[in-house]
A protein has these predicted regions:
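Hydrophobic, well-ordered beta-alpha structural blocks that scaffold small-molecule cofactor pockets
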Residues: 1-43, 48-50
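Alpha-helix C-terminal capping/helix-to-coil transition sites in glycosyltransferase folds
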Residues: 11, 68-70, 116
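Residue-level detector of alpha-helix initiation sites
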Residues: 20-22, 81, 127
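Hydrophobic beta-strand scaffold residues
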Residues: 37, 57, 96-97
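Short loop/edge segments at beta-strand edges and connector loops
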Residues: 41, 58-61, 101
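Glycine-rich, highly charged phosphate/nucleotide-binding loops
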Residues: 50-68
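ADP-ribose/adenylate-binding Rossmann-like module
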Residues: 72-76, 83-109
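An accessory alpha-helical subdomain
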Residues: 127-194
Length: 194
């Protein structure tokens, strides 16, 4: 059973084993969260080369010692046996493992998501139908456009002011509930007066 969780990557080192399209997609997910990644493969999709210093590329076949210094390992090769070997080694070494072609061998899966600043909405079908996750993500991207990054930031700033201004928790909760019903322009007006 998988449990939805947001993972703090700040002090974690990540390696992706594989250099194809799926590995690139996984790499881009981590880069989207400001995390540099090491990628190990005997050959790379040319788009990896365009990523510059955000990615450390190791041009080699998988060897067990490569994963020693990493906390998170993504097995994204096109060889099921290699992916299984990586998963087995990661279990022995207590590394978090995601095997892209096997939910059963994975400690975690990476949900489809919509990210707007600090607003993060994860979508998962438990690996049953990724196309549905993609469809839902597309719908959510239209509802929660790029302006929601500013909206969340402004609500966060107002929340801090409300916490200082209202000592009564019930009253504070009611004010915050009312704020989230307002649009960004209304919030900007309120911010001027607090």
């Amino acid at each position: 059973m998988f449990y939805p969780v947001n993972l703090n990557l700040d002090n974690m080192e990540i390696i992706i084993v594989g250099g194809g399209n799926v590995a690139l997609r996984k790499c881009m997910n981590f880069l989207d969260f400001g995390k540099s990644v090491t990628v190990l493969a005997p050959k790379f999709d040319s788009r990896f080369l365009e990523l510059g210093n955000k990615v450390d590329l190791i041009n080699d076949i998988f060897k067990e010692e490569y994963i020693d210094k990493f906390d998170i390992v993504v097995a994204a090769t096109d060889d099921k046996e290699v992916n299984e070997e990586i998963a087995c080694i990661c279990r022995k070494k207590s590394k978090l493992i995601n095997v892209v072609d096997s939910r059963d061998l994975s400690d975690f899966t990476v949900s489809s998501y919509v990210k707007r600043g600090d607003l993060l909405i994860g979508i998962s079908t438990g690996g049953k139908i990724p196309a549905l996750s993609s469809k839902i993500r597309g719908e959510l991207e239209e509802i929660y456009d790029e302006s929601f990054a500013e909206y969340v930031d402004l609500l966060g700033e107002l929340r801090e002011k409300i916490i200082k201004k209202y000592e009564d928790k019930t009253e504070r909760k009611e004010v915050l509930k009312a704020l989230v019903k307002l649009d960004i322009e209304e919030l900007k007006e309120i911010e001027k007066n607090i």
